[in-house]
Amino acid sequence: MANCGESKKRVVVLGGGMAGSLVAKTLQYSADVTLIDPKEYFEITWANLRTTVEPSFGERTVINHRDYLVNGRILTSSATNVTENEVVTADDHVVPYDYLVVATGHVEPVPQTRTERLNHYQKENQKIKSAKSILIVGGGPSGVELAGEIAVDFPDKKLTLVHKGSRLLEFIGPKAADKALNWLKAHRVEVKLGQSVDLRNVSDEGTYATSAGETIQADCHFLCIGIPLGSAWLRESILKDKLDNRGRLMVDENLLVKGHKNIFAIGDITDIPEAKQGYLAQKHALVTAKNINLLMDGQKESKLATYQPGSAIAIVSLGRKEAVAQFPFVTISGCIPGKIKSKDLFVTKTRKDRGLDSGIPSSKNKCS
């Protein structure tokens, strides 16, 4: 590390999601860290569907950046350009860096403040409570998990899930998809595969038309489909030639952007051949933090830690007590994988990784 008489190296982290928040927290005492994020908080994104049915859960999962980044600067803005040694933000801040970490993930229009985000969940929850019938569009992990949360917490609701693919959960294997489908059907969720929904033409009576010519009656809908990568702004930057044809930054085994010695990319924005999952993004963050510390210590690039793409492991929650899990050699469903993920959704661990307590009120920690 730098000697006491030396100024610390400047590390700028773009994006305060699963990856960006952890790398900023990890480096805050060894480097001069600046986190640039359009929102004032970090969110445990895989828990937001539970927060939709239980808004108070958000008190633990929506966390102000300042709660974990106590020794760094926070700029609530978006990056609009990057040069060899500076980042330019939407409000015309010019932020110099010695090391840059691009962790901008996906672009999702969310509120800027924690209070606004928690209020959003209250409104979504009220939307569910007020509806007798609900349409979920999208059968990836978000759509399946939302259907599971509503089916368990609000079993009286009529639920329909429409997915354009031939099976659910296409990012993992067909065995896991079949188990999820069977669970949804057993919990009275109507699943329509191989169809899409035209959300631009919904009748006043709540009639939705599918691409197969079917109609669905629903009082409200939730859109659970993919959102674009947060890389469009890079197309006019020095990194424009480092984007692949899908808009992902190409990185080497050290998570350095190819052709650069001081710019890292982590999380969903990378071209690493693996499923884009939060726990893997956090592994990226720890490897990158280690490598930046090594570089600040004067180590050669040959000494840097390498990242191996993650294997096809996934756990998809099915309500509060069950889940479907895919491991390298087995796929299981039910209460066993549910105990691994579904009860707490790894919230306590994720908070601990950022130096925070569980966030559970003390009265709930006591034995009954």
Feature map (PLM): residue ranges:
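A Rossmann-like FAD-binding core segment of flavoenzymes
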Residues: 74-77, 81-88, 95, 155-253, ...
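FAD-site-proximal beta/loop scaffold in flavoenzymes
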Residues: 114-132, 216-220, 224-286, 290, ...
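Short strand-loop-helix active-site module centered on a catalytic nucleophile
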Residues: 134-149
